A protein has these predicted regions:
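Alpha-helical substrate-recognition element adjacent to the catalytic core
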Residues: 1-181, 259-261
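C-terminal cap/substrate-recognition subdomain and adjoining C-terminal extension
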Residues: 1-3, 12, 120-145, 149-284
Length: 284
């Protein structure tokens, strides 16, 4: 338990009791992808996202990498600035994603680049995710993966498939490219999903995803970002039990994580604790 902080044990236990009482038929799970399903630290270095692999490993040339890093430096500063309003941040995030997608298309981003990025040793699933995902599918509990990935739904599916954890109980809410016959990206479909609009509305836009969860009011929510607590905004939630993976800058971010999450998991922790909670719910 040394990597787990539960600020209010009584509240945590009360929520868990309600979820267990409701049973698996009333439960679904919502997870972020980058830094939650994937490991955030590989070989001692931070891997913030799938798109960072494309950006850092020079697959699209030096000009792309330079411009992509410049966009990150400009807009990430706005994203984490406590003085900037949420409304202004949402405008900035939309602009960041639009500009980056335009840059990717300009540089000829294709499915071949996804295949190359997929081979990167920096893309690894969080320890224990496979067992967690297998338990969900065995008990017919839906998993909604909510991601603002710049690599799109194709990359996420390929990562899961490569690791033999792409299951039919999963629904992926993220960005989608339009490809030409040669597998080259020519556009991005609306709506664009960015860091600050991953919410219930984004699920409702995908009828198949919403259908699987609409009668399952209890939620386990797992993410590595305080901003992602909004992944349940707008939903008719019964009981929400949230897990925050605090992977880096612990001293700086711990207070915010403790305030927003029922449980905080430190240092790129494995999935052991969420697995134990799920076993409890499933009666295992």
């Amino acid at each position: 338990m040394e990597n787990i902080i539960i600020q209010n044990q009584e509240k945590f236990d009360e929520k868990l009791k309600v979820i267990v009482s409701g049973g698996i038929d009333k439960l679904h799970v919502r997870m972020d992808f980058d830094g939650t399903i994937t490991k955030a630290i590989v070989g001692g270095k931070i891997v913030p996202s799938l798109i960072s692999v494309l950006r850092d490993e020079d697959f699209l040339g030096a000009d792309y990498s330079q411009k992509a890093h410049a966009l990150y430096n400009k807009y990430h500063a706005i994203e984490i600035d406590p003085v900037v309003s949420v409304a202004d941040k949402k405008i900035a995030m939309r602009k960041w994603w639009e500009t980056h997608f335009d840059l990717l298309i300009e540089k000829g981003f294709s499915k071949c680049h996804i295949q190359r990025a997929l081979q990167s040793a920096r893309i690894r699933l969080r320890d224990g995710f496979g067992e967690f995902a297998a338990m969900l599918v065995k008990n017919k509990i839906p998993l909604v993966i909510m991601s603002c990935s710049g690599m799109g739904v194709d990359m996420i599916k390929m990562v899961l498939e490569k690791n033999n954890v792409l299951f039919d109980n999963m629904r992926i809410v993220t960005n989608q490219y339009e490809w030409n016959d040669d597998g080259v990206a020519i556009a991005v479909k609306e709506p664009i999903v960015h860091t600050l609009n991953k919410d219930e509305e984004s699920i409702r836009r995908i009828p198949d995803a919403y259908k699987t969860i609409k009668n399952r009011p209890n939620v386990l929510l797992l993410t590595d970002s305080v901003a992602d607590i909004t992944m349940a905004d707008g939903a008719k939630i019964g009981t929400l039990l949230s897990f925050g993976f605090l992977n880096s800058n612990i001293d700086k971010q711990l207070g915010a994580f403790e305030k927003n999450f029922d449980a905080v998991l430190l240092n790129d922790a494995p999935m052991n604790f969420p697995k134990d909670i799920l076993k409890n719910v499933c009666g295992k």
